[in-house]
Amino acid sequence: MAVLEVLTFPDDRLRTVAKPVKTVTPEIQTFIDDMIETMYDEEGIGLAATQVDFHQRIVVIDVSETRDEPMVLINPVITQKSGDDGIEEGCLSVPGAKGMVPRSAEVSVTALDRDGNEFSFDADDLLAICVQHELDHLEGKLFVDYLSPLKRKRIKEKLEKIKKFNEKN
């Protein structure tokens, strides 16, 4: 397994709409393992394939307290939403930034597992929010898109300064 490089805002590749996975191959399964390792290495609770510059509809999530229950969602679709919720979200692709994002309180999801078998589940609380956040990535959308233009601009400027500093050192 390998830790993958996570793209950071404002990288245009994060705006790519992911394509469906046609066939779950051994290469896709290895890539999923790398995504899970990357998510844990970055101390995240979710990671979409687009965040690591692979533009297919794959998401990994682990909101468990023990950090040992990864969920794999291939070609996920939210089939139903209800209620209103929202928390101050962060993102591995927007390091150091947080913002309040409105989300549905409950979602129903259908996806394929890592072996290509279809399954469905209902989610609420943090899992529902995380699913919505990661599926946004598959559509080329980031949590900063929900923020005011001024806050988004400030976050972008801050991350660009950090990037320039890191490139010099």
Curated annotation (Swiss-Prot):
<keyword id="KW-0648">Protein biosynthesis</keyword>
<keyword id="KW-0479">Metal-binding</keyword>
<comment type="similarity">
    <text>Belongs to the polypeptide deformylase family.</text>
</comment>
<dbReference type="GO" id="GO:0042586">
    <property type="term" value="F:peptide deformylase activity"/>
</dbReference>
<feature type="active site">
    <location>
        <position position="134"/>
    </location>
</feature>
<dbReference type="GO" id="GO:0046872">
    <property type="term" value="F:metal ion binding"/>
</dbReference>
<dbReference type="GO" id="GO:0043686">
    <property type="term" value="P:co-translational protein modification"/>
</dbReference>
<feature type="binding site">
    <location>
        <position position="91"/>
    </location>
    <ligand>
        <name>Fe cation</name>
    </ligand>
</feature>
<feature type="binding site">
    <location>
        <position position="133"/>
    </location>
    <ligand>
        <name>Fe cation</name>
    </ligand>
</feature>
<protein>
    <recommendedName>
        <fullName>Peptide deformylase</fullName>
        <ecNumber>3.5.1.88</ecNumber>
    </recommendedName>
</protein>
<keyword id="KW-0378">Hydrolase</keyword>
<feature type="binding site">
    <location>
        <position position="137"/>
    </location>
    <ligand>
        <name>Fe cation</name>
    </ligand>
</feature>
<dbReference type="InterPro" id="IPR036821">
    <property type="entry name" value="Peptide_deformylase_sf"/>
</dbReference>
<dbReference type="Pfam" id="PF01327">
    <property type="entry name" value="Pep_deformylase"/>
</dbReference>
<dbReference type="GO" id="GO:0006412">
    <property type="term" value="P:translation"/>
</dbReference>
<dbReference type="InterPro" id="IPR023635">
    <property type="entry name" value="Peptide_deformylase"/>
</dbReference>
<comment type="function">
    <text>Removes the formyl group from the N-terminal Met of newly synthesized proteins. Requires at least a dipeptide for an efficient rate of reaction. N-terminal L-methionine is a prerequisite for activity but the enzyme has broad specificity at other positions.</text>
</comment>
<keyword id="KW-0408">Iron</keyword>
